[in-house]
Amino acid sequence: MVDIYYSRDGANSFFVINEKREAVLIDPSFSEHRGLFDHINKLNVKIVAILITHGHWDHIASLEEICHLYPEAHVYISDDEAEFLTNVDLNLSKAANEEGYGVNILTYLPIHLLKVNDRDIIEEAGFKFKVILTPFHTKGSACFYLENEKALFSGDTLFFSTVGRSDLPTGTVKTMESSLKKLKELPVGLKVYPGHGACTNLDREKKYNTYLKNI
């Protein structure tokens, strides 16, 4: 099953949970007033792995504490994106804190950090996630495709009726089309779990999302 936590700053976190209540957490978002951790307690799950779609602060803000609570959990991020975890300029936490968010970002890399690349398969908690690199929002942005669950975790690559911006550090419009084409070629019937906003499905986006439709 897939469970969703909507953080108060607007970023989404997702839990893919097996029958043993083991969970793969996708994007440990900002946890204002302990909201994310209260949600984990309510779910009564053990976090065994963390998948990061990209390294902006609103998608990794709770990573340090999650790693303390679940020290054996594997952390997956694309090879090109790993430096974002501790770089306050790349992950935009410096700018966020100047606006008063109070974000605590990792000052060290997690012990069980695993760097992945395009088409790699991540096997955790009985699930198989295929890595789809989609660089343009950031240079190492990735989506995670869970074929058996017909689910796509798209981070800030694909949203309901639109796509992510490309004007932030390391972002580029040059690779947008090739990145989105990878998603457009995926099978029909996929539910899309984006990094912000409402969930959607790939069939709808192929039909109505201008960025996908025109590729």
Each language-model region and where it sits:
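Conserved beta-strand hairpin/beta-sheet module of binuclear metal-dependent hydrolase folds
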Residues: 1-43, 143-155
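Short acidic-hydrophobic surface loop/beta-edge motif
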Residues: 5, 16, 118-126
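Short catalytic-loop micro-motif centered on adjacent basic/acidic residues
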Residues: 23-27, 49-51, 131
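Small/polar loops that bind or transfer phosphate-bearing groups
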Residues: 25-28, 77, 126, 194
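Active-site HxH/HxHxD metal-binding segment of metal-dependent hydrolases
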Residues: 30-34, 38-121, 207-214
